[in-house]
Design a protein with these regions (language model features):
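Long, distal/terminal scaffolding or interaction modules
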Residues: 1-294
Length: 294
């Protein structure tokens, strides 16, 4: 049933659409309890679309849409590559089971969203705001994206945040290896980062009140800052070939060949400086009140 609102926004309630492009080029449309069944490109080349309590099953259901709100909706496994080339989208209180969501976009906001297959999700997005989002499975979420703000993220997806710029993260629990590779301008607060090879080959990385776990963390990193961070006792070979300013609370097991900077911790298991260290080789390392100059 379709009806006209005073605002000239059309409302569609309790309908099902299938086939190819059933709502192509529509605008100023509100969908309530609508199901997009098997088919392709259910909503495409549209403007100002709202969806509430809707379900999406077909492929590519939401492409080339400018201005959208999605609330309390479900995207099934078959709705792969669902939301691409879409700008100014707000999604809340929804669940996504399909892979390869959110690509080539600008201004994306998610709150209270769970993505159960985060494979190749959030690629080439400029302007992401996330609050209370869960990512499971898949590889390389957030790749090539920039201007990202996160407050509340749980992720066990592999290789998150690679080739990203201008990233601010709060209250995250990230379990993966190779996260934050080849990134620029990253600040992470009050988070747990668990996985090998954190932030290799990145620039301007700042970690504040974070807990780190994994092997060979923070290597080949330029302009690295750690403030009031803790390190899992199993971590080793940290800071190799990095320029670093680090204030570590508690113990760090092994530091290897930092290039320059200043590292202080309450205790240090061992320091490895060998013939492969790079110039200028002038990092100052302290066990509070006991100093080593390399």
């Amino acid at each position: 049933m379709m009806q006209e609102k005073k605002s000239n926004t059309k409302v569609i309630r309790n309908e099902k659409f299938g086939g190819e492009r059933p709502l192509f080029a529509t605008h100023d449309l509100r969908l309530e309890n609508v199901t997009i069944t098997d088919g392709e490109s259910g909503i495409k080349q549209c403007q100002n679309i709202e969806a509430y309590n809707c379900k999406f099953y077909g492929k590519y259901p939401w492409w080339h849409v400018d201005g959208a709100k999605i609330d309390n909706c479900y995207f099934a496994l078959g709705s792969r590559s669902a939301i691409w080339y879409t700008n100014d989208l707000v999604m809340t209180n929804s669940r996504i089971d399909g892979p390869k969501f959110f690509r080539e976009m600008k201004n994306l906001t998610l709150e209270n969203v769970e993505i159960t297959d985060a494979d190749e999700t959030f690629w080439k997005v400029d302007g992401i705001r996330i609050k209370n989002v869960k990512l499971h499975g898949g590889t390389y979420p957030f790749m090539f994206s920039q201007n990202i703000f996160v407050d509340g993220l749980e992720s066990d997806s592999k290789y998150v945040f690679q080739y990203c710029k201008n990233v601010e993260v709060h209250n995250a629990k990230i379990l993966t290896k190779d996260s934050f590779w080849e990134c620029e301008n990253v600040t992470i607060y009050d988070s747990t980062l668990d996985g090998e090879y954190l932030a290799w080959h990145s620039k301007n990385v700042r970690l504040v009140n974070c807990h780190l776990a994994g092997e060979q963390l923070l290597c080949y990193t330029e302009d690295l800052v750690l403030e009031n961070c803790t390190i899992d006792p199993m971590c080793d070979r940290m800071f190799e070939y990095s320029t670093v300013e680090a204030d570590i609370r508690g113990h760090i097991e092994n530091i290897k060949n930092p290039t320059s900077g200043h590292i202080v911790a309450d205790s240090i298991g061992s320091i490895t400086i060998d013939e492969n260290v790079r110039e200028p080789n002038n990092c100052v390392i302290e066990v509070r009140n006991k100093r080593y100059e390399l």
